[in-house]
Structures are given as C-alpha cells and as structure tokens.
Swiss-Prot record:
InterPro entries: Ams1-like_N (IPR054723), Gal_mutarotase_sf_dom (IPR011013), GH38_C (IPR041147), Glyco_hydro/deAcase_b/a-brl (IPR011330), Glyco_hydro_38_C (IPR011682), Glyco_hydro_38_cen (IPR015341), Glyco_hydro_38_cen_sf (IPR037094), Glyco_hydro_38_N (IPR000602). Belongs to the glycosyl hydrolase 38 family. It is found in: Cytoplasm. Transmembrane segments: none annotated. Its cofactor is Co(2+). Cleaves alpha 1,2-, alpha 1,3-, and alpha 1,6-linked mannose residues from glycoproteins. Involved in the degradation of free oligosaccharides in the cytoplasm. Co(2+) binds at residues 259, 261, 371, 576. It comes from Mus musculus. This is Alpha-mannosidase 2C1. Inhibited by 1,4-dideoxy-1,4-imino-d-mannitol (DIM) and EDTA. GO terms for molecular function: alpha-mannosidase activity; carbohydrate binding; metal ion binding. Keywords: Cobalt, Cytoplasm, Glycosidase, Hydrolase, Metal-binding.
Amino acid sequence: MAAAPFLKHWRTTFERVEKFVSPIYFTDCNLRGRLFGDSCSVTLSSFLTPERLPYEKAVQQNFSPAQVGDSFGPTWWTCWFRVELVIPEVWVGQEVHLCWESDGESLVWRDGEPVQGLTKEGEKTSYVLSERLRASDPRSLTLYVEVACNGLLGAGKGSMIAAPDPEKMFQLSQAKLAVFHRDVHSLLVDLELLLGVAKGLGEDSQRSFQALHTANQMVNICDPAQPETYPAAKALASKFFGQHGGESQHTIHAMGHCHIDTAWLWPFKETVRKCARSWSTAVTLMEQNTDFIFACSQAQQLEWVKSQYPGLHARLQEFACRGQFVPVGGTWVEMDGNLPSGEAMVRQFLQGQNFFLQEFGKMCSEFWLPDTFGYSAQLPQIMQGCGIKRFLTQKLSWNLVNSFPHHTFFWEGLDGSRVLVHFPPGDSYGMQGSVEEVLKTVTNNRDKGRTNHSGFLFGFGDGGGGPTQTMLDRLKRLSNTDGLPRVQLSSPGQLFTALERDSGQLCTWVGELFLELHNGTYTTHAQLKKGNRECEQILHDVEVLSSLALARSAQFLYPAAQLQHLWRLLLLNQFHDVVTGSCIQLVAEDAMNYYEDIRSHGNPLLSAAAAALCAGEPGPKGLLIINTLPWKRTEVLALPKPCGAHSLALVTVPSIGYAPAPTPTSLQPLLPQQPVFVMQETDGSVTLDNGIIRVRLDPTGCLTSLVLVASGREAIAEGALGNQFVLFDDVPLYWDAWDVMDYHLETRKPVLGQAGTLAVGTEGGLRGSAWFLLQISPNSRLSQEVVLDVGCPYVRFHTEVHWHEAHKFLKVEFPARIRSPQATYEIQFGHLQRPTHNNTSWDWARYEVWAHRWIDLSECDFGLALLNNCKYGASVRGNVLSLSLLRAPKAPDATADMGRHEFTYALMPHKGSFQEAGVIHAAYNLNFPLLALPAPGPAPDTTWSAFSVSSPAVVLETIKQAERCHQHRTLVLRLYEAHGSHVDCWLHTSLPVQEATLCDLLEQRDPTGHLSLQDNRLKLTFSPFQVRSLLLVLQSPPN
C-alpha cells in the first residue's frame, strides 16, 4: 500500500470515498462521471397502442418520429420505439452501449428476439451492443424497444400499494449510444465494496480500517481524467480482496433469483412480458458468466414464455442442460400456503412437476415458496409425496410479534413427515450483493454453530428485474476475503447438500408455520374465496363422475385435456396474491372470469358424465340424484318441477353413487324421522325443532338457545346471544388488503340495526325456516334465512349481504357454553388445534387465523362446530366462536368486497368428540350438495354405489383418471385419515378392478405397493392424517 499520510478522521475519509463514486455529487470530476465516454444520438420513431402486441405485429405498425423528452401513456398502454443507430467508426475496439432511460418497463428486441429488459428501478439502463467493437462488425442497426406503461411494481397512485393511476403518463428521458469504460466500472465496484467493508465491520475492526485506508489510497492514486492511473488503483483493491480468510469462514451460497408475482399490482398478461424482460436479461448474464446459476420457479410462467417467446424458452432449456438455469419449486405457481385445499396443493405439484419433467428433463428437488402468507402443517407430507424433501422460504421474517427461532431446521408436518427447511438469514429474496447483506446473512443466522452454510438470493424481485452484472461482480470479489464470509456462486442443490451434511445438529419445528401478519388475506375479496371453494368442488365432482363413466361405458372419453385446462385456471388463481385478495381490481376481474370459465365448462362436463354413467340402464326418463362423497346420505333436496318451480323431497343416495329421483307418487306419506316443527311466539321469537336439535331465535334473528334434544344440553352460553353480527374498525398500519391488526378487536360493535321483524319462511315438515333483515349501517344491509331440515344435525344460515363500507370488518359470533383451552380447525387433509387463550405472545399473535370448512370447540362429551361453505378467516377466543365474513380495504383495489354477497354457515352442537359426532362428514355435505342431473335417456330405477369405505375416519377425497399411465383405463384414488388415529379399513368397490397398486402423489407406482383384491375389497392401513394414493387398473366394460 502506498505510504501517503492522512489524518485519523474516519468520517471525512469515508465520505471522501463516497463522493468519489457518487452518481449525484461532483460527477464532473469524480470517477462515476467517467463511466461513459463519447456518445452519439440515435434516430427514434414510435407508435402507441392499448394492446400488448406480439413483435411480429408491432413492427408492422405505422411509426411516427419521436425524440427524447416525449411523453406517452396512459397506464397499461404500450409504446413501441424503433431505434435506428449508426456506431461511429472511431469506436472500434471499445465497448458500446445503448443507453436508455424511460419510465415504465422496457424490452429490447434485436433480430426478432427479446434480448434484455431495461428498467431504471431495476438498475438496467443500458444494453451492451458490443463488448469490443470490431472493424468487421455491422455499425448500422435497427432495434425495437417495447415500453410497458407500468413500473416494476405497477402504477399505484401516490403509494406502491394504492390502486393504479389510470391517467399516469410516462416519459423517455435518455436514448443514445455511448462508449462504456469497463475499467471504471470495475474500480467503482471495488470502492463500493471497500466502503461496505469499512462500514459493516465497524471502527472496532482492524480489517475495517484496512478497507478504508485501501479505498483512500485508491482515490489518491486514481485520477479520473487519466486512465493510465487506473491499473495502480486496481492493484490495491486486488491485494485487499485477495487476502483470504481462514477455514472456519461461513459459506454463503449466492443464487441468482427473480421473484415475479404471477399477478399482483399488474394483470396476468403483464406478467408474461415481465418474464420475457427478466429472463432474457438472465440469459445474457449466463452467457457472460459461466459460473452464474439462476433459480427459477413457477411452471405457469415458463409455459407462458414457451407459448409467446419460443426462442427465449429454447435458450432457457439450453442453459438448463448446462446446469446454469435451475427450475425450482415444483408447483404450477407459487400458491398461497393456507387457503387451497389439500387436493389443490397436490395438483400444484402434479401439474408443475410434470411440466418441468417434460420441458427440462427432470423434476424439481426443492419446494420454493419465498413470499406466501403462512404454510400449512400438511405441506411436508404433500412435498414428500411429490418427491421433494427440501424447502426454501423467508416470509416468516415478516412476523410482527415473535421472531422465528430458526433459519435452518427440520419441519415436521401433521402426519410426522419431515423436510429440511432453509430461510436465507438475510431475510430477503431480493439481495443485491452488498457487504451489508453478506454480513447480515451471518450475524442474523439463528443456527450459527449448527451449520456453516447459508443461502443468498440476489436479484430484483416481486415485479421482476432479476440479477445484474454489477451484483455478480460484487459477489465474485467477495469469494474469499479476510474478515467476511466466503461467497460462492451456487445452486439450490449445492446449498441443501451442504446443509444436509450438518443436519445432525439441527432443531425440529412441529406443526404449521404461521405468519404473524397478513391475517386479513383469509377474508379480503370474499368473492375470490367463494369462487375458489366452488371451483374446487366442481372439479372434484366432474372428476368423480367422469371416472365412474369411464369405468362403466366403453364409449365414454374421459375429458383429460379439458380438466387439465380448468385445473390450471384454478391453480393460477391460487397464486398467493390472487386468492388472498391482495391484488388490483384488474387481477380480481380476471380471476372472477377464470372462475366463471371453470363453472361454464365444468357443468356441461358433469352432465355429459352423468349421461354416460346411466346409459343403457332401464327406467323412466327423469332425474338422477348423485352423491360424490364416500358415505351414504339422506337429505332434503329441492327437485325441479316441469313448471319451473321446485318441490322438496327426502332422498337417500349411496356412497359415491346415484339413486333415481323420487316421483310425486313415490313420496313417503310418513317421514322416517321426526318432521321439523316451526313455532312463532307472541314475542316474535321463532323455534325450529327437528328432534335432533332445537333452535330458538329472538325477534332480531339472534340465537338465544341451541339445544341438543337427546341430552337436553344447551350450546349457547347463558345470557349470551349467538348469530350475533359484529362490526369492527379495520385500519391497518400499511398493508391494507393484507392486514387486520390486533387492535381491531378493541373496536367491537354489535350490529343492532333491525330492518324488519323475524318471520317464518318454510313452515315445517321436511324443512322449517325463519328469515329476517338487518341494517348493518346506512349503506349496508343483510338478509338471512335460518333453515333446519328433517334429520339434519346442524342449522344453516343462508345469508345475503349488500356491503358498501370503508375499512370495516364484519364477523358473526357464537358464545358457547363450553370451556376448553384449545379449539380445532380444519386444514388440508386434516385438522389442528390452536389455543383459545392469550398466555404467551405466540398465543395472542393468533388473534385471527384460518380454517377450511369447519372449526370446533369441545369439552368432554360435548362440543359445538361452526361450518361454512366459502369462508376461511376465523377465531375462537375464550368460549366465543367467530367467523370472519367481509372486509372493506381500499388498497390495492378500492372496490374490494363492495357489492352483493351470498354465503352459508351452519352450527352443529354434538355429543362426544367432533370425530364421533360426524362433524367432518357434515362439513363435507354442506360443501358438496347432492346433484340432481337430468338423465337424457331412461334414468336407472335402482341405486348404485361405486365405492365405500368401512371407517368413518378415512375420507376418499379424489377419484380421477391417472395422468401418465399408458393404460387410459387407470384411475387414481386419494384417501386420507381425518380423525387423527391409526386405522385399518376396507375400501369396497363395484367397479371392474383388474389391478390395484399404491402410488405417490405424482401417480408414480410404488414397486412394493401391490394390493390384493378380496371380494371387491382392498385393505388399507393409515396412520394419523396420512394421505394415501392408489392406482386402479380397470377391466374394459362390455360394449
């Protein structure tokens, strides 16, 4: 090091170096001002369009002259620029860039292919035309730059998460050719890193002073106006970074990454272009840096690129073969980790892994979900069943209350399955390669001493962008520098292999990974939640009926292609910013259209399968009553009449089968169960009684009593009211659509605005009901019909709400005459317990939680279950069961939840445990109504059942055609243990089964899993909450 004296003033020395590299201060004489040399203008022309045109069509449009300073827009439009350039001959031998700065996101097209994204926000403002211009290179070129009128993070008006500004205009601020000085860039990287070391290690560190002294000497030596001084300065930096650390250094595995939300503050169609912008840039970086590895998730995005940018897709496949482009995740999209059903989660992997295998030759080894809002306790089992034992995320670093105690650990799921989990300790998936981030990765690591390896994801994310060459340059400098951890450009596989070597020292976390934030996403955009639940049910039913039709009809063609398309739409909507409701209005509208596509195409598939199912059966033309659930059901059903009206009938349908609809002459004159009695008292209250439960409603519609008749046990707390609607103020700290804060509970106000007296609806017999109106506020109202059917163990609340609020939260509460320290909540393929008290911060941080179809509060021998058909937010505090109904956030969608809503919830008191009482079956029944489908020909006059299960603890969840079997007449059955018990059971079938074998969730045959068929029965063994899948090869039916 040169021995130039300087005063011992740390701050002035530090800031001197800062100014020497500043892009703002003293650029007329500092090093940053020499990054670019000579420049020349380009010739511009443009055209503006509201459409997202393909390149071939765009370049055929009429372009008009344009210039720097031009404005274009508005939001979501696209401006195409034709850039005609001539490189000066005197630049031969130099590196030449197109310098481009504009608002919005840009994509450079060269020779008809996308070659690089350009965004100011993503620090990509130049495109390398030539790394070293040769005399033989063409100097006249025409490029096209496609500029999307939105930023990396959308176009929020005044705030990132505000609704988009539809009038926002965009401007081109720079377009020119310039000579790029790579040696200046290299020195700038060196000096920035030296400053980072000096600051990061602090004034107590010898190495910090060495870094600062080195940087200061470089400034002394380097004259920006004299490039011949650069090598001496560079030598000082090389000496510093070449001083290596010891063997105990922590190793950071740096992986290129570009998190692109499949939709969020921009619509789905813009995401397609974000992928092209980001991944074309990554391809260029992989070409220039053979040690650079880029991890990429989400099969849906790759499928979009394959369809719309086939040349780019081919390049990605090429780099995948080289090991530089690494598909990760294994799922169709990075889905929400809470709301999708267990079967939908399986399909995320089934569709994703099959796509990766088809397009890249292998399946993913790591589950990759860095940005979702919590992680179901069933994910470890689902992952393992899909060939994955490694999981990477970091979202729990966002916890608002408790700091999660691990960064590398084993996660044990509901059934006992274990996977290795890593949270990158830098608590980000968008690192930029700074010294500060590298140091935080070590100092913040909560598993120091247990493992000496950490992951480090670098690249701009959320809205795309990805890594830059500068990030790579920084990380390469830090590969092995004394005082810092060792940094190696690595892959997810290399990281987890290193972690597995240290796995004997790791701790285990059991149960769900609950994010203590974003609890509002269980409720926001209720219509999206309803669409999700309904479409999961539709696809389930279509698959069941189509499978049965395949088994019974030689002519029936299973609609595999149509079902794959509909499933992929549903899986797309389960992206973690869509089904959660944390998206802009454009996205919500697209998602609702996708749900409508599933309904409109799914219902005809149901009818076609039903027609094929009963083809050739004797009997009169009429209706077929179909049960798609694996237990016998006796229920009241509204059957259509020829005149268009409906009549009620009590029908019994066997497990996964059908029964003929009763004709008017066949209706029983006497009911096998006690009929429903309805009585209105003089005080206006109404009592409904079916001999199983007795319901009493006060004149406002509140529940004053709910009695289990056989025992006389009252379920409603003494002096309290059930079915009490309550309104809360709902103003979070920032994340409007995402968060409901703990303090909202302090603002509870019962809804007391009665709009009409309680009236009797249906007067009894097969069904009794009462209805009422409620004025929630001057702008919002509610109507509800309370329904009790003969033989039904629960009372239903059919609810319609006209909701026009701002930052309010509507819930319904049921105070129970029950005491228990924990409540039970249904999750995917099972259930779990959460506390009803606030003993610890981990307990009270769960003030708002999620569940699927039911929650239950039980004490010894008695309990109360709250069922629903489309809600997810819930809580049980003390003895009060609460269901979250509607929110009213204003960002990023100002219209979220406004308008009309319909939903149903139900209340079921029960003797004994919820398992013994059949709560799980009841919740399924509420969500999967019996189907009354017209038989186009003669309807069968006898009942028929395809499958049944001997144990009520085992649920036959799915019946579908196998995806990849060579024999098309192969079915997949998926069953799970629902009670939390070890069970041996028999699966009965009437189908012509030729062979039965166990398989994994990806439908790959278990070589040791052959099952013997005995009298049309298969014996199966389950451990608690275990999910098992079978392949059934069918015999061909007679023609």
